């Protein structure tokens, strides 16, 4: 996937989440283990979001790219985020979401899957 398309999708996802009342903590959080696209808070829940963007259906739906291996990577990176920011898991609910962004000409469609894994 083109990095530019991915960046556009992530920007649209951040805008979408803010409009839904989420507070964005971090974007593109990277460790040696991997990356989480968006980390946000909604009420008493820390939400780790994987954003998948497609400009065509040639590679299937965006969420199909979030396989078991990718899920485990996101879980490991989320643990690193919590540790490095001294956030206790007992203090917050944790959730793992996937946001699909489909770019169609000059329009887009967002599908937000809460508790995706």
Curated annotation (Swiss-Prot):
Lineage top rank: taxon = Bacteria
What sections of the protein cross the membrane?
none
Identify the InterPro entries for this entry: Restrct_endonuc-II-like (IPR011335), tRNA_endonuc-like_dom_sf (IPR011856), UPF0102_YraN-like (IPR003509)
Q: Which GO terms describe its molecular function?
A: nucleic acid binding
**Family assignment?**
Belongs to the UPF0102 family.
Q: What is the official name of this protein in its record?
A: UPF0102 protein Clos_1471
Classification lineage:
Bacteria, Bacillati, Bacillota, Clostridia, Peptostreptococcales
